[in-house]
Amino acid sequence: AVGAATLRIAPSHVVTRDSTDALAIANAHAAHALHFIWRHYRKPIRIDDIAGSVSITRRRLQTLFLQELGRTMQEEITRVRTAHACRLLSRTALKINIVAQQAGFSTSLHLHRTFQNLLKTGPKAFREGGFPIPDLGVLPASAENAGA
C-alpha cells in the first residue's frame, strides 16, 4: 500500500548448513587438496601426501593452491590446526600437550611456537586471558570433527 511503513524483523538465530562449509574454488585439484587438509589435519601431513591424493605433481598443486586460496598448503595446515587448538583451549580444560596432540601439532613446543608466531601469545596465556577465538579465515564446521 502507498505510504505503508517498512517492518524489519531481526533474525532470531543462525542455522549452519552444509553449504556454509562451501568455498568457491574453481580448480578441482586445489579444492580436493583443501578438503584433504580439512579431513587429515590432526595427523602428520606432508605436502607429498596431499599431491599424491590428487595425482598431480607437488609443484603444480602448490601453484594451483596458492593461486586459488592465496596461501600455501603448509599455511593452510597450520591455520586449521591453530583454529582447532584455539577452540579446544577456549572450550575445554584439556592439558596443553593433549590440545597440541588433538589439533595435529607434533609437540606442545610446536603448538607454543605457532601461537607465539601467529597470535603473539602462548596457549596457556590464550586460555587464561579469555581471548576470543581469532578469525583465521574460513574454517568449516566439518573440519572441527575431522580426523577424530
Predicted regions and their residues:
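DNA-binding recognition helix and immediately preceding turn/loop
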Residues: A26-E76, T92-A103
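Flexible loop/turn connectors
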Residues: A1-A22
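…primarily DNA-binding HTH/wHTH and HhH modules…
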Residues: A22-H29, H35, L109-A148
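Short hydrophobic/aromatic patches on the structural cores and recognition surfaces of FHA
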Residues: L61, A85, L111
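Short hydrophobic clusters on alpha-helical segments that form packing/core surfaces
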Residues: A33-I37, F65, L69, M73, ...
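Terminal helix-turn-helix DNA-binding modules in bacterial transcription factors
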Residues: D48, Q67-S106, G129-A148
